[in-house]
């Protein structure tokens, strides 16, 4: 707990990180591992629930199809496919995002363990990479938790009464992931954190532009700004519709 700061017996607070802002973000960096773990747990429960619901939809039959005596499977209905396969596609995307994040986090951890990265006094590139990692971990956790709660509820409903039976685990998974919306950070606050960090990164990018680069930036963006504020885009869209 006193890796970056300490409190003496007389109550004096000292820290090896002089900047309050950097000290704050350095302490926040310790939450990255937990948020990755919570997000990964939520994503894993979601994939397990989808596997159960999709398999059930391929087996469960109801109502006769075109041929007499043959009943349609649940998965044959378009509305049933949409309610399961769209979340399944998003789960694949989150899994790939998770793997990329874990690789990046491992690289940063290896650099710290090797002594090439001092969390208390990082280089400018390391400081920005650390903040980016914090933002990515935050949005991954928030997105995975929200997706888990919505998808597991959908899986439960897609399986009908069978989905409510504890032996089929869907209600267990649903109860398991509910806490993840606030565990390791409230999802709403985490999204606000990501928005703040994006604005900060945007400010860095603009402040480092050369005069020529700034002029080019203004010219390339002024058209879009004027279009949005004048309502031209809405008028053109109305004519197109």
Predicted regions and their residues:
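Flavin-dependent oxidoreductase catalytic core characteristic
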Residues: 1-241
């Amino acid at each position: 707990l006193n890796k970056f700061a300490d409190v003496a017996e007389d109550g004096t607070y000292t820290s090896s990180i002089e900047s309050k802002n950097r000290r704050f973000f350095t302490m926040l960096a310790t939450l990255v591992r937990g948020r990755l773990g919570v997000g990964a747990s939520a994503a894993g429960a979601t994939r397990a629930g989808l596997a159960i619901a999709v398999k059930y939809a391929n087996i469960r039959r109801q109502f006769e199809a075109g041929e007499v005596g043959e009943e349609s499977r649940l998965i044959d209905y378009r509305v049933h496919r949409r309610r399961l396969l769209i979340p399944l596609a998003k789960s694949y995307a989150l899994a790939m995002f998770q793997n990329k994040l874990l690789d990046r986090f491992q690289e940063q951890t290896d650099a710290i363990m090797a002594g090439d990265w001092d969390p208390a006094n990082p280089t400018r590139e390391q400081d920005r990479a650390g903040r980016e990692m914090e933002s990515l971990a935050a949005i991954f956790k928030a997105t995975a938790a929200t997706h888990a709660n919505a998808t597991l509820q959908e899986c439960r409903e897609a399986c009908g009464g069978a989905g409510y039976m504890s032996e089929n685990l869907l209600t267990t998974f649903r109860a398991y992931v509910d806490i993840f919306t606030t565990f390791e950070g409230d999802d709403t606050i985490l999204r606000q954190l990501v928005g703040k960090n994006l604005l900060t990164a945007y400010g860095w990018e603009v402040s480092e532009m050369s005069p020529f680069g700034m002029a080019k930036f203004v010219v390339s963006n002024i058209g879009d700004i004027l279009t949005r504020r004048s309502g031209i885009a809405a008028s053109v869209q109305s004519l197109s519709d």
